[in-house]
Amino acid sequence: MKKILVTGCNGQLGRAIRQEYKGEDVSFINTDVAEGEGIVALDITDVNAVLALVRAERPDVIINCAAHTNVDACEQQWDAAYRINAIGPRNLSIAAREVGAKMIHVSTDYVFEGNGTKPYTEYDEIHPVSAYGKTKAEGEKFVREFADRYFIFRTAWLYGDGKNFVKTMLRLADSHDEVSVVCDQQGSPTSAVELARAIHHFEPTENYGTFHATCEGDTNWAAFAEAIFKRAGKTTKVNHVTSEQYAKMNPASANRPAYSILENYMMKLTDGYKMAEWQDALDEYMKTLE
């Protein structure tokens, strides 16, 4: 029986991973910062704790879904962001190498500066501008340095079972006649379910490396909100605002990529795997909320 250790198992992707493998001959070691039913408490920033658990369980695969993902908070919490987003992946990679486990690490579009004019591929040079992006970039470096067999999946605009943009918009629609949403940031909304499927597809293979993993197609946040409202039958008006206008309304907010469209180039090069169109993935997700 294959044994998989998942960190951040209570997050959007962690939950989707467990659901994706449901019914298969797989044993999960579910970990998160807090202990719970069927969940082992693990502080990934503590190398001794990570090594102790991995040595005891000897998993075949480690999937790191844990991260400090609050982009604005990262600007004020550099130390915490580095510990979770960089040191954590380092510790897991050290442990994975020791027991011969595959290391799967989830990263982000924020490793790019975000001012491009064409989709970023895995071969484009990274240049993060936010604390979140910089700490995630360091996490990638540690994985490459310490893990023998690894997959790094960069994703973007993720939503799933948990707090996310889709649910925030639907909640606002229940109490507001109109909402203001940024219209000049381009990206690819990606469901946690689709990302989990991609990870599941590549995990048994030897196609190691860095992969972009977003749903196909692209949009902007305001248009994404409109697509959500349309599918939910909401009449809430979406006011399109620029990033500059948003920054004035929220001065503590971090810099966000204006253009963060990722091309899943490595997936296409290795075995032709294709993720769903973002509209189709959103349709599937909205049905789960009915």
Region spans (language model):
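Rossmann-fold cofactor-recognition segment
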Residues: 33-46
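Mid/C-terminal beta-alpha module of Rossmann-like enzyme folds, strongest
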Residues: 198-199, 205-252, 278
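Conserved C-terminal active-site "lid" loop/helix of NAD(P)H-dependent oxidoreductases
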Residues: 220-226, 245-290
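NAD(P)H-binding glycine-rich loop region in Rossmannoid oxidoreductase-like domains
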Residues: 44-84
